[in-house]
């Protein structure tokens, strides 16, 4: 009996030591020194082999050299949509049905920070899979507003740092290298010093930081198009006349909302002249993508400067861009983010939504 008790005690002790060792081993496995290197996107999940879109002179072209125009929409930050239970394949199917060939993902620094990159990559992965299945392209936009060199921003949701911005593009370009579905990287949404309230914008510094970002991206992936915005909330490209960003394969972004141009007499020609002088001229030498545009009436939901218009803006801006092969992406396919394209999640079009849906349908 005594021998049996001793044997049992030894067995229990051995079992407990084994459990402790396993637990300790598991704990070690979770240590920072055992975190694996980042992985790349699994392209076996994609069903369509899409053409890479490239820069050729002042045009975007497909692999056959045919001119390609992006025509599409902005959605809200994917994290917002997921929180509202609106992040789904059916959303992308609706965008395709409207006629979009590109979807812009405005990734806010605050949502990136809240989720962490591993969790947010899962969201982007879903967008890539869904867009690819519908033969649509994606623009990834680091959606901050302010002046990055001075790290001063318009709202806490846009707060970031140079280090975080460089790390974001390093990680994104590594993960999605060679994935044709992600065609464009919009390096910084809307640079502005807010009239001195966010530092003092200097084109040399802005040009330099964009060139450095492009170098990081190109070290991982040269098949993507870096997109650079000018000052005044991505409206003013005049500095590139004398000092263009010194990197190949790039395009320029513009957000030509209706109240940005202020002619004394509001004729179509006067608007055209102002647009041409501030940003339209760039299309003679580089691809230009209007990654935000749209309008809302003065009494409409979320009406604010610079997006208020009586509707005359729509036909005029479309004519201007079409004459110059400028790609366009409307803001925003969301019932809350103004100017809105839809009134609700039944996808009922607003005034501008109806207009731009017709424009998209012409190219389906």
Stretch-by-stretch model annotation:
Residues 83-102, 106-107, 113-144, 150-187, ...:
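An active-site-proximal structural segment forming one wall of the substrate-binding cleft
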Residues 1-4:
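Positively charged n-region of N-terminal signal peptides that target proteins for export
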Residues 21-102, 358-360:
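N-terminal carbohydrate-binding accessory modules
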Residues 8-18:
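Bacterial N-terminal signal peptides
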Residues 52, 84, 156, 166-184, ...:
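Extracellular glycoside hydrolase catalytic/binding regions
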Residues 64, 68-89, 112-116, 153-157, ...:
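Acidic/histidine-rich helix-loop elements
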Residues 77-79, 109-113, 146-148, 191, ...:
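Feature marks short, surface-exposed loop/turn motifs that line or immediately flank catalytic pockets
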């Amino acid at each position: 009996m005594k021998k049996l008790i001793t044997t049992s005690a030894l067995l229990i002790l051995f079992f407990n030591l084994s459990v402790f060792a396993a637990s300790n081993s598991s704990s070690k496995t979770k240590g920072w020194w055992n975190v694996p290197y980042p992985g790349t996107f699994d392209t076996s999940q994609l069903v369509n082999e899409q053409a890479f879109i490239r820069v050729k002179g002042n045009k975007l072209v497909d692999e056959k050299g045919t001119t390609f125009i992006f025509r599409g929409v902005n959605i809200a930050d994917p994290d917002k949509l997921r929180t509202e239970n609106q992040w789904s394949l059916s959303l992308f199917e609706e965008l395709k049905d409207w006629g979009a060939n590109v979807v812009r993902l405005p990734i806010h620094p605050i949502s990136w920070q809240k989720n962490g990159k591993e969790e947010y990559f899962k969201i982007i992965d879903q967008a890539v899979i869904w867009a690819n299945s519908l033969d649509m392209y994606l623009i990834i936009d680091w959606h901050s507003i302010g002046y990055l060199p001075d790290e001063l921003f318009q709202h806490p949701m846009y707060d970031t740092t140079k280090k975080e911005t460089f790390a974001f593009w390093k990680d994104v370009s590594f993960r999605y290298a060679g994935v044709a579905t992600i065609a464009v990287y919009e390096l910084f949404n809307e640079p502005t010093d807010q009239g001195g309230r966010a530092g003092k914008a200097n084109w040399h510094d802005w040009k330099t930081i964009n060139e450095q970002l492009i170098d990081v991206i190109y070290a991982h992936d040269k098949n993507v198009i870096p997109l650079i915005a000018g000052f005044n909330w991505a409206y003013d490209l005049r500095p590139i006349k004398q000092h263009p960003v010194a990197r190949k394969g790039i395009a320029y972004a513009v957000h030509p909302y209706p109240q940005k141009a202020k002619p004394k007499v509001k004729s179509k020609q006067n608007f055209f002249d102002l647009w041409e002088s501030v940003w339209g001229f760039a299309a003679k030498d580089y691809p230009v993508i209007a990654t935000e545009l749209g309008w809302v009436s003065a009494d409409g939901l979320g009406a604010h400067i610079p997006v208020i218009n009586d509707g005359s803006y729509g036909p005029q801006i479309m004519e201007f861009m079409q004459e110059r092969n400028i790609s366009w992406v409307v803001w925003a396919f969301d019932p809350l983010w103004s100017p809105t394209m839809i009134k609700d999640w039944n996808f009922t079009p607003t005034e501008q939504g109806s207009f731009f849906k017709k424009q998209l349908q012409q190219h389906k």
